[in-house]
């Protein structure tokens, strides 16, 4: 009988450790999954030529994201697929002009040019963990919510 109790106790300890590790793994997975950088517009509809306010939230705890000095954003229109408007080539060297720190919320105004009416979004090229003044190299792209221009 003592061997049976010893086995039962060891089995209980192994199951407890397994469940503890499983619980911690699930919590870490859900925590890491919720870390992201989000770009949203304050309105769902804009009038052609109106200023658009963008809010950028970096919910990562350990990643800084930086933006281009040439083209910090691109306006895209949905026409079956998402297509950016044509932009002239940048006349100066493309450097990192600003960054959003981990946990930071930032906002800025975008002056919308006169463009086609329809569904649009903002595309923002980012450089992860770059430094101000450094040459910008795109490591990712983040998209805003969709909005309508009338």
Label every PLM stretch briefly.
Residues 114-150:
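Terminal connector regions
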Residues 21-31:
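Hydrophobic alpha-helical membrane-insertion segments, chiefly the h-region
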Residues 61-104:
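The feature marks short-to-medium sequence segments in extracytoplasmic or secretory-pathway proteins
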Residues 87-119, 127-130:
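Short, solvent-exposed, Trp/other aromatic-anchored flexible loops in extracytoplasmic proteins
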Residues 4-21:
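N-terminal Sec-pathway targeting helices
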Residues 54-61:
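Asparagine-centered strand-capping/turn motif at beta-strand->loop junctions
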Residues 44-49:
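Short, solvent-exposed loop/linker segments at the N-terminal edge
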Residues 39-43:
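Surface-exposed, proline-enriched loop/turn segments that connect beta strands in immunoglobulin-like
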């Amino acid at each position: 009988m003592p061997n049976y109790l010893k086995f039962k106790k060891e089995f209980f300890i192994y199951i407890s450790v397994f469940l503890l590790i499983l619980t911690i793994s699930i919590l870490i997975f859900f925590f890491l999954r919720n870390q992201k950088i989000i770009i949203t517009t304050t309105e769902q509809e804009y009038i052609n030529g109106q200023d658009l306010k963008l809010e950028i939230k970096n919910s990562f705890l350990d990643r800084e994201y930086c933006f281009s000095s040439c083209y910090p954003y691109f306006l895209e229109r949905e026409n079956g697929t998402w297509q950016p408007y044509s932009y002239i080539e940048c006349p100066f060297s493309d450097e990192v002009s600003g960054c959003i720190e981990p946990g930071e919320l930032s906002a800025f105004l975008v002056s919308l040019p006169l463009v086609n009416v329809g569904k649009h979004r903002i595309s923002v090229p980012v450089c992860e963990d770059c430094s101000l003044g450094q040459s910008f190299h795109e490591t990712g792209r983040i998209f805003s919510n969709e909005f309508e221009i009338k």
